[in-house]
């Protein structure tokens, strides 16, 4: 049977603790220590926790306070050296650095405490919303907070107007900041060589249209000829006897105002002997009018969306063609130039041809450049005294006022037309500059702008005319900050670069994502009709093989 063994109890009547010390521990020196203490520490920093002398050594740790385990090196007089202990003068920043750091730490701590307090007092659903808001705020700051330039928005890469092939060689590169510094003043007065076509008179009833008396835009089926330079029979005839640089007003306006462009575009240059021909590619988008190209956030819809950049450009071109004919007195008296329209055949109905006149003009740029340009007028207008004024008719269209920092035309066009034109200048600076250059080259007395909006925001097929406005090209150029000297300087620079090239075909291409234009040399046969036929035959053969 188990029994209880009473232990030996030591009674110390004069104190506390054991009465006797075992023999093996008698007379042994002891110093409190910790396993975390380093042996032979250079200095003991653990004892300086409290700076107030009233609490010195009261709560300090005594571990490692002795010198039993310290390592002492023998004195070596050779290593003795004097040290300069004089205090250096601190700068104002160094003196206040700790003060600012402590202030920032206190501020951050207060914010964290306040945030924690707010989270504690919110209900559960509100807590989740607050945490989600803080998470999104941190994400936004991480993405955009470190940017130095707030105007650099994240834009997806744009496509080039033409695919650059591997066998194309870069001959020259010009950046926009360099082109913006160009100036050229030695431009002679233009000389009219030949005038062709017939113009209809402008209907002044369109000047009285307001937002309250809007007029539907009609679809007018007329033929518009957009013939390139080398296909123009008049230019071919003139090139035999005079001139060494040939182009159309649309091509030159693209070059003269290129520093405002954002989207990619291209122009074909042919060097034949000592002559230069500026052309556009067949079946290209060169004649399409861009929409909100220079806006801070241009349209970026993709696919078949009616607000995609290409569909908006086709809509704007459709509106411009119809308005330029609807605002004329169609079917009535015409103003005829001495020569007929060179692109109209004899068996064609004259009423099916759009009202347009061609003025072939000549400029002398110095002693070596003889420039011949085909310019266009869209209509003619009679003044109060019966004088005749030639006009260019263009159209600005509203597609959705909620985008691109737009202004609602139906509310602002009559009362604040200046705000509307200022917004359009910001969003369509390049397009307005091109139109102004074309009017200046043609010598038009006025530039007519029509304001056309969608009948409904979601319907891109029906439109209404909300008003018109008239400008003198020179005055409008000053309003939109278009320097005519800079425009001629850019053109002269491009011509000089192309004149230095060898005979052949070249391409001037605006980079789709950079402010730079490049000149590429093209192999023989590029962009020719024979090459297009071969590509079509290859595509047909591939389709037949797939079907087989």
From Swiss-Prot:
Q: Using the UniProt annotation, give all residue ranges assigned to the region (RNA gate).
A: 285-299
Q: Please give the residue positions where the record annotates the modification Phosphoserine.
A: 161, 528-529
Q: Where is the composition biased (Acidic residues)?
A: 529-548
Main location, first listed in the record? cytoplasm
* Written domain comment of the UniProt record: The RNA gate region regulates mRNA cap recognition to prevent promiscuous mRNA-binding before assembly of eif3d into the full eukaryotic translation initiation factor 3 (eIF-3) complex.
Self-association and partners: Component of the eukaryotic translation initiation factor 3 (eIF-3) complex, which is composed of 13 subunits: EIF3A, EIF3B, EIF3C, EIF3D, EIF3E, EIF3F, EIF3G, EIF3H, EIF3I, EIF3J, EIF3K, EIF3L and EIF3M. The eIF-3 complex appears to include 3 stable modules: module A is composed of EIF3A, EIF3B, EIF3G and EIF3I; module B is composed of EIF3F, EIF3H, and EIF3M; and module C is composed of EIF3C, EIF3D, EIF3E, EIF3K and EIF3L. EIF3C of module C binds EIF3B of module A and EIF3H of module B, thereby linking the three modules. EIF3J is a labile subunit that binds to the eIF-3 complex via EIF3B.
Q: Spell out the protein name for this chain.
A: Eukaryotic translation initiation factor 3 subunit D
Q: Which source organism does the UniProt entry give? A: Bos taurus (Bovine)
């Amino acid at each position: 049977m188990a029994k209880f063994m009473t232990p030996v109890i030591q009674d110390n009547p004069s104190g506390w603790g054991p009465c006797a010390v075992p023999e093996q521990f008698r007379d042994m020196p002891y110093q409190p220590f910790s396993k975390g203490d380093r042996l032979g520490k250079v200095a003991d920093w653990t004892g300086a926790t409290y700076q107030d002398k009233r609490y010195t050594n009261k709560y300090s740790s005594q571990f490692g306070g002795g010198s039993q385990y310290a390592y002492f090196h023998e004195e070596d007089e050779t290593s003795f050296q004097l040290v300069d202990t004089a205090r250096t003068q601190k700068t104002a920043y160094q003196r206040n650095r700790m003060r600012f750091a402590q202030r920032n730490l206190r501020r951050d701590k207060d914010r964290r405490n306040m945030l924690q307090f707010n989270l504690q007092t919110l209900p559960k659903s509100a807590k989740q919303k607050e945490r989600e808001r803080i998470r999104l705020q941190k994400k936004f700051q991480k993405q955009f907070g470190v940017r130095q330039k707030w105007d650099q928005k994240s834009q997806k890469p744009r496509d080039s107007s033409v695919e650059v092939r591997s066998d194309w060689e870069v001959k020259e590169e010009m950046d926009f900041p360099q082109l913006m510094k160009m100036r050229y003043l030695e431009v002679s007065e233009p000389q009219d060589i030949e005038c062709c076509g017939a113009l209809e008179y402008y209907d002044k009833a369109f000047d009285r249209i307001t937002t309250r008396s809007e007029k539907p835009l009609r679809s007018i089926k007329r033929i518009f000829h957009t013939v390139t330079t080398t296909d123009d029979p008049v230019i071919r005839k003139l090139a035999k006897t005079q001139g060494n640089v040939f182009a159309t007003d649309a091509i030159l306006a693209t070059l003269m105002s290129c520093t405002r462009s954002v989207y990619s575009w291209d122009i074909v240059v042919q060097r034949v002997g000592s002559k230069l021909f500026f052309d556009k590619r067949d079946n290209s988008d060169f004649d399409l009018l861009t929409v909100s190209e220079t806006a801070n956030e241009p349209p970026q819809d993709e696919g078949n969306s009616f607000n995609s950049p290409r569909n908006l450009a086709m809509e704007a071109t459709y509106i411009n063609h119809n308005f330029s004919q609807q605002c004329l007195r169609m079917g009535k008296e015409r103003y005829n130039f001495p020569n007929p329209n060179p692109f109209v055949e004899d068996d064609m109905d004259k009423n099916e041809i759009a009202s347009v006149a061609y003025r072939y003009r000549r400029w002398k740029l110095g002693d070596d450049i003889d420039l011949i340009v085909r310019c266009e007028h869209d209509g003619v207008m009679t003044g109060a005294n019966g004088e005749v004024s030639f006009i260019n008719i263009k159209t600005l269209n509203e597609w959705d006022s909620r985008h691109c920092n737009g202004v609602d035309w139906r509310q602002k066009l009559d009362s604040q037309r200046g705000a509307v034109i200022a917004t359009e200048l910001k969003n369509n600076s390049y397009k307005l500059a091109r139109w102004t250059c074309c009017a200046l080259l043609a010598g038009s007395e006025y530039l007519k702008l029509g304001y056309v909006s969608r009948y409904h925001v979601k319907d891109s097929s029906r439109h209404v005319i909300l008003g018109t406005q008239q400008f003198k090209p020179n005055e409008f150029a000053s309003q939109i900050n278009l320097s005519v000297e800079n425009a001629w300087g850019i053109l002269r620079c491009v011509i000089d670069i192309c004149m230095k090239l060898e005979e052949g075909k070249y391409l001037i291409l605006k980079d789709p994502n950079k402010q730079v234009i490049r000149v590429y040399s093209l192999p023989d046969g590029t962009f020719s009709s024979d090459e297009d036929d071969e590509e079509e035959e290859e595509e047909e053969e591939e389709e037949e093989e797939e079907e087989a």
